[in-house]
Design a protein with these regions (language model features):
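C-terminal substrate-recognition "lid" of short-chain dehydrogenase/reductases
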Residues: 148-175
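Catalytic loop of short-chain dehydrogenase/reductase
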Residues: 45-49, 55-59, 70-108, 119-120
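Rossmann-fold cofactor-recognition segment
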Residues: 1-10
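Substrate-binding pocket helix/loop in short-chain dehydrogenase/reductase
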Residues: 36-37, 44-46, 136, 140
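Conserved Rossmann-fold SDR core element
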Residues: 97, 106-121, 168-175
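Catalytic Tyr-x(3-8)-Lys segment
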Residues: 133-154
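Short beta-loop-alpha junction of Rossmann-like oxidoreductase domains
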Residues: 35, 119-129
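Conserved NAD(P)H cofactor-binding loop of Rossmann-fold oxidoreductase domains
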Residues: 26-35, 177-178
Length: 182
């Protein structure tokens, strides 16, 4: 794995120009802010879009990938199940999924797919008080058909699937424990 600053056009272009083509590129980096449209400052909204959408766009645009290889974007369940306090995040995720479908056409024979995770127990949530985080996970698990929140391995398996299946392109795979139907 290689870490790149997805906000740095020059670093991204320099990296891919100096690299041999990749078999697979996964773009999961982002920093977004939640909040209602009325409450989220426009500067924070623009920074979120710059990070998650335009960051993925930059990498997908510059990435050198072998024919038959893949690019996988990571969106999120809010594109399918919006929240009044996460409107922007839902819109960004929907935009990423549309970008993935369009890139599948443009970049063919490179395959492009999107994985859309639900609530996943990652370090992202470690900033919450322990009792609040555990309560949120328990409430979510109760309403999910899978009866649990996701683990990073659940998303890794989905990314591996779309990366290695030669017939998967232009698809969005939702891995949310049934959250979009619950």
């Amino acid at each position: 794995p290689t870490a790149l600053d997805i906000l740095d056009d020059a670093a991204i272009e320099t990296f891919f120009a100096a690299s041999d083509p990749f078999d697979h590129v996964v773009i999961a980096a982002s920093a977004t802010k939640g909040g209602s449209v009325a409450q989220l400052p426009l500067a924070a909204a623009k920074a979120s879009m710059e990070s998650k959408f335009w960051g993925a766009y930059r990498v997908a645009r510059a990435a050198k990938v072998v024919d038959g290889g893949s690019i996988t974007l990571v969106s999120g369940f809010l594109s399918h199940r919006p929240s009044a306090t996460s409107v922007l995040q839902g819109a960004i995720n929907a935009a990423l999924e549309a970008l993935g479908r369009g890139l599948a056409l443009e970049r063919a024979p490179v395959r492009v797919n999107t994985v859309s995770p639900g609530l996943i127990d990652t370090p992202l949530w470690r900033g919450m008080p322990d009792t609040d985080r555990k309560a949120m996970f328990a409430r979510t698990a109760e309403r999910l058909p899978a009866r649990r929140v996701g683990q990073p391995e659940d998303i890794a398996q989905a990314i591996l699937f779309v990366s290695t299946n030669p017939f998967a392109t232009g698809s969005t795979i939702t891995v949310d424990g049934g959250g979009t139907i619950a």
